[in-house]
Amino acid sequence: MFFKMLKEDVDVVFDQDPAARSYIEVILTYSGLHAIWAHRIAHALYKRKRFFIARAISQIARFFTGIEIHPGAKIGRRFFIDHGMGVVIGETCEIGNNVTVFQGVTLGGTGKEKGKRHPTIEDDALISTGAKVLGSITVGRGAKIGAGSVVLHDVPECSTVVGIPGRVVVQNGKKIRRDLNHQDLPDPVADRFRELENEIRQLKQELRRKEREDEL
């Protein structure tokens, strides 16, 4: 079972990366594969309470790959890290099957609380370059997180989230309409003009008062 999972980690590279040409190339040169293999060994030791050895393997993998995966994180089958540099996955993170993440992704916490404090990523999700998914939230099955997004709340399944903070723009293949009342949007320039008009009005009133005093 364990070795079958390792082979699936190789196979998913060919499914997801058109640049992959041979098993030798993938096994020897793909840092994402090296990181996930190291994690599977570290996680097995972590479950047996061999915490120090598990963390040591994790840190060695981080040094060689630039990918940091806490050995306590639970990761499903056919997990693919594309490019990978700067990926961080926290201790209580749970990742389902057939999940893809790109470089610079953080699956992290939002504080120092104990217990479940990292995201749950369900099957078939995709998290694009530089996205940050933070806190004990759930990214639903088949969801997509856009590049550079910051996600702080649950993401429905089969939806697409973009932006800071992340917002749903597509769900079940349909665009989400968000009507904006533009007249209610803040306008700092207009606000400053109103302040200047008030100041000018007050100065004119003060000037007229001074003129009346001089006439007397």
Swiss-Prot record:
Q: What biological function has been recorded for the protein in this entry?
A: Catalyzes the acetylation of serine by acetyl-CoA to produce O-acetylserine (OAS).
Tell me what this protein is called: Serine acetyltransferase
Q: Give the EC number(s) listed in the UniProt record.
A: 2.3.1.30
Pfam families on file = Hexapep
Q: Gene3D superfamilies annotated for this entry?
A: Hexapeptide repeat proteins, serine acetyltransferase, domain 1
Q: Which GO terms describe its molecular function?
A: serine O-acetyltransferase activity
Please state where this protein is localized: Cytoplasm
Gene Ontology biological process: cysteine biosynthetic process from serine
Q: Where is the signal peptide?
A: none
Q: Which UniProt keywords apply?
A: Acyltransferase, Amino-acid biosynthesis, Cysteine biosynthesis, Cytoplasm, Repeat, Transferase
The record's annotation in InterPro entries points to: Hexapep, LbH_SAT, Ser_AcTrfase_N_sf, Ser_O-AcTrfase, Serine_acetyltransferase, Trimer_LpxA-like_sf
Enzyme class, UniProt record, top EC level: transferase
Keyword Transcription regulation carried by entry = no
